[in-house]
Swiss-Prot record:
Reactions this protein catalyses: (1S,2R)-1-C-(indol-3-yl)glycerol 3-phosphate + L-serine = D-glyceraldehyde 3-phosphate + L-tryptophan + H2O
Function: The alpha subunit is responsible for the aldol cleavage of indoleglycerol phosphate to indole and glyceraldehyde 3-phosphate.
Active-site residues, record numbering mapped to chain: 49, 60
PANTHER family listed in its UniProt record: TRYPTOPHAN SYNTHASE ALPHA CHAIN, CHLOROPLASTIC, TRYPTOPHAN SYNTHASE, ALPHA CHAIN
A family per Pfam: Trp_syntA
Name of the protein this chain belongs to: Tryptophan synthase alpha chain
Keywords: Amino-acid biosynthesis, Aromatic amino acid biosynthesis, Lyase, Tryptophan biosynthesis
Record-linked HAMAP family: Trp_synth_alpha
Annotated pathway: Amino-acid biosynthesis; L-tryptophan biosynthesis; L-tryptophan from chorismate: step 5/5
Cystine pairings recorded for this chain: none
Amino acid sequence: MSHIGVAFDKARAEGRAVLVGCMPAGFPTVEGSIAAMTAMVEAGVDVIEVEIPYSDPVMDGPVIQRASDIALAGGVRVADTLRIIEAVAATGVPVVTMTYWNPVEQYGVDAFARDLAAAGGTGLITPDLIPDEAQEWLAASDAHGLDRTFLVAPSSTDTRLEMTVEHCRGFVYATALMGVTGARTQASAAAPVLVSRVRGVTDLPVGVGLGTGTGAQASTVAGFADGVIVGSALIRCLLDAPSLPAGLTALRALSAELAAGVRTPAH
């Protein structure tokens, strides 16, 4: 079983959901992002999702875009991302990477898979890659023992959903809201329906992303999903802070609140 699968199994045995916290690599700096992700782990985040900053992040909301722009302006490269992954993986939590496909193609698909595995990464979430066009990635992830997470949405047809899920390993990423990511005031009513559709075709855990920003929302999502994925709300802790130390304090507090939320699922 994959490292991330173990995290989901452990959470299930404890009657709770997994908390996945996302942060772009190199935001606010390379060392700053390592400090931020380490703080999240110390506050109770179960899995870290490291996003590779990209200049045209079509599915990311304004908060993640702004953080990615800061990282890119600082000159962050894929090699830096791998160093960050290695540092965070050393804490013992699973580290999954989210990336648009272009940076992987530019790096070389097999070389990227090899280097990601060597850094201790567990796998990839690929928002703009569909299994039908992923032959090279399917082969590379098999060769290097990496998980692969494709996205399903409320708009996915049954055929598309089944085919997508069939090619996932580790967990399935269910996007709870249509459109770009970002903290919302309420969880999408479509999310529980989507999760039950996914569970109808696979035993893989289902993580729900897009919109969670408070402990209460995390508790709600934990009531119907195996994983609660949070990005924008955590990133905003750093964006809105006057300094990195102040940002890390806010980040720890929100991470702890979210961690408490996933441990008290609302049924």
